[in-house]
Amino acid sequence: RPNLGNPIPLVKETLLKLYENHPGLQIASVTTTGYGEELVKNAFHCDRGLVETVAHFTAAKHFLPDVDFIIDIGGQDMKCFKIEDGAISNIFLNEACSSGCGSFLQTFAQALGYNVKEFAALGLFADKPVDLGSRCTVFMNSSVKQAQKDGASIENISAGLSISVVKNALYKVIRASSPEELGRNIVVQGGTFYNEAVLRAFEKEMGVN
């Protein structure tokens, strides 16, 4: 959920729900990470903060010890980590443009009259995803409008945008010449991958499932 520049109320709401759903719960220790790391840590007197890259790697390694590559796509940015010999060997970040991130999809969903969850679900029913390339939001907007004029369905536009997100990550941020360069054991993270159409587009591009 967007925090509108102030994550404190959202964190408070989440904690209250946690206690409500688990009466008697006692939290032994709390670590914060991400953009609001210090702010949230100080506001809620958390035990410590952890650099975001270390948090991503630690979580990925916990669930997949032999992880080769981590892709994190959030609302505003994208981070990718190459793992070699059990350590991060390279980090790839997207440029200032938020094209290919969660806010990118949300912008188009709202412009077309949907919330992002509905818009993502429609993409799973595409029969001919629109080829929108992997350009920035401004140019992509004109491509979407042209696709609408050409009679493309919302399903095919949604799927096309999801494919653009994936291709932007693989071929512009990581600059891979082929999906195989990422390795065999890949972990995806970040809220954008809750978009089932993006996850499916990634699986298809990687040649799995």
Residue spans for each PLM region:
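Glycine-rich phosphate-binding loop plus the immediately following alpha-helix
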Residues: 85-128
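Glycine-rich phosphate-binding loops at beta-strand->alpha-helix junctions
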Residues: 35-36, 164, 177-205
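Gly/Thr-rich phosphate-binding beta-strand-loop-beta motif of the actin/hexokinase/Hsp70
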Residues: 67-84
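Phosphate/pyrophosphate-binding loops at sites that engage ATP/ADP/AMP, CoA/4′-phosphopantetheine
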Residues: 14-28, 169-183
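Short glycine-rich, Thr/Ser-proximal phosphate-binding strand/loop in the N-terminal lobe
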Residues: 1-9, 13-17, 90-91, 95-97
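Adenine-nucleotide phosphate-binding core of ATP-dependent small-molecule kinases
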Residues: 142-171
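Short glycine-aspartate micro-motif
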Residues: 27-31, 66-71
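Short beta-strand-loop/turn "lid" adjacent to the catalytic site in phosphate-handling enzymes
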Residues: 2-4, 19-53, 82, 89-90
